[in-house]
């Protein structure tokens, strides 16, 4: 298993190189002149040209990419064109709010989604199944920005129970985490139901029932572990999606996280911050997928890696 883990880590190198090239090209294809934005609206052509030279944007693209690559290999993500602070410092200030928002969203979404999926599978085609799948379809159909504004209007503006924006106390996490986790809970419910329906039809489940084992133990002890493998895969993908896909929710709730930083950086054409954030999100997805593969063996000891 250790050899498999090392091989997978080495396999990350070409993937990250490809991501670096694509990110660099994508960022430099964005419309707009970052030198003009950094210089300000009142700046004349001479000042803009000086800013362009200072930022290194007057160099050919291959030269800029080589500079970008060598800096990353040295652990230097560059300096923000807007704040003039190191990009690592900008990301460090925003990472924890996004991380904890993701954890809160994922926690309730997994618990609620798996519970609905298991209940829907056990009482397949019954009223619990219909109610559960209706909730799941509703969660997938409702856009995040619309759900966020609706929750904000009801619980913050009308009732005054919860704060509207910010991330100062645990109360600030409730509405954004509900908004961000709604679609994930819906996906988890549908995926868990599909996986459990297949498991409930297996021979070992019928054998356990024939031996007189209680239905709750049959479902939770024999069914849950075998149904978890595809569910864990989806869980890992959804966690990566939440960590890198909270842009809309962070913008709606004015959340001081990575998503809002990325939106602001795109608006200001802050190349170093955009490149660093997209690379960070890509690395997160890759590492989460690797972690999911490692969890397979813990869930099902029959799985071995070579």
Curated annotation (Swiss-Prot):
Pfam families: BPD_transp_1, BPD_transp_1_N. It comes from the Bacteria. Residues 30-98, 152-168, 250-278 are periplasmic. InterPro entries: BPD_transp_1_N, MetI-like, MetI-like_sf. Residues 95-292 form the ABC transmembrane type-1 domain. Residues 1-8, 120-130, 190-228, 300-306 are cytoplasmic. Keywords: Cell inner membrane, Cell membrane, Membrane, Transmembrane, Transmembrane helix, Transport. It is a multi-pass membrane protein. PROSITE patterns: ABC_TM1 (PS50928). It is found in: Cell inner membrane. One of its GO terms (cellular component) is plasma membrane. One of its GO terms (biological process) is transmembrane transport. The chain crosses the membrane at residues 9-29, 99-119, 131-151, 169-189, 229-249, 279-299. Part of the ABC transporter complex GsiABCD involved in glutathione import. Probably responsible for the translocation of the substrate across the membrane. Belongs to the binding-protein-dependent transport system permease family. The complex is composed of two ATP-binding proteins (GsiA), two transmembrane proteins (GsiC and GsiD) and a solute-binding protein (GsiB). This is Glutathione transport system permease protein GsiC. The lineage of its organism: Bacteria, Pseudomonadati, Pseudomonadota, Gammaproteobacteria, Enterobacterales. The gene is gsiC.
């Amino acid at each position: 298993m250790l050899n498999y883990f090392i091989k997978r880590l080495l396999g990350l190198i070409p993937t990250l190189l490809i991501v670096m090239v694509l990110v660099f090209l994508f960022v430099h294809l964005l419309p707009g002149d970052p030198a003009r934005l950094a210089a300000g609206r009142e700046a004349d052509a001479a000042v803009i040209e000086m800013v362009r030279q200072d930022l290194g944007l007057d160099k050919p693209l291959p030269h800029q990419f080589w500079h970008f690559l060598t800096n990353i290999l040295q652990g230097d993500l560059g300096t923000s064109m807007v704040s003039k602070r190191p990009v690592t410092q900008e990301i460090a200030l925003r990472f924890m709010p996004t991380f904890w928002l993701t954890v809160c969203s994922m926690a309730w979404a997994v618990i609620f989604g798996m519970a609905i999926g298991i209940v829907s599978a056990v009482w397949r085609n019954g009223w619990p199944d219909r109610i559960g799948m209706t909730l799941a379809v509703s969660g997938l159909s409702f856009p995040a920005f619309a759900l966020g504004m609706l929750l904000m209007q009801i619980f913050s503006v009308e009732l005054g129970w919860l704060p509207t924006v910010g991330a100062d106390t645990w109360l600030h996490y409730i509405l954004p985490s509900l908004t961000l986790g709604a679609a994930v809970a819906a996906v988890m419910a549908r995926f868990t139901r599909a996986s459990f329906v297949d498991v409930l039809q297996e021979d070992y489940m019928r054998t356990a029932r024939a031996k007189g084992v209680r239905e709750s133990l049959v479902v939770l002890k024999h069914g849950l572990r075998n149904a978890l493998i595809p569910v864990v895969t989806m869980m890992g993908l959804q966690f990566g999606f939440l960590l890198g896909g909270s842009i809309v929710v962070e913008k709606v709730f004015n959340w001081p996280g990575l998503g809002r930083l990325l939106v602001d950086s795109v608006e200001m054409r802050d190349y170093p911050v955009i490149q660093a954030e997209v690379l960070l999100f890509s690395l997160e997805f890759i590492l989460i997928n690797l972690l999911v593969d490692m969890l397979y063996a813990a869930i099902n000891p029959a799985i071995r890696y070579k």
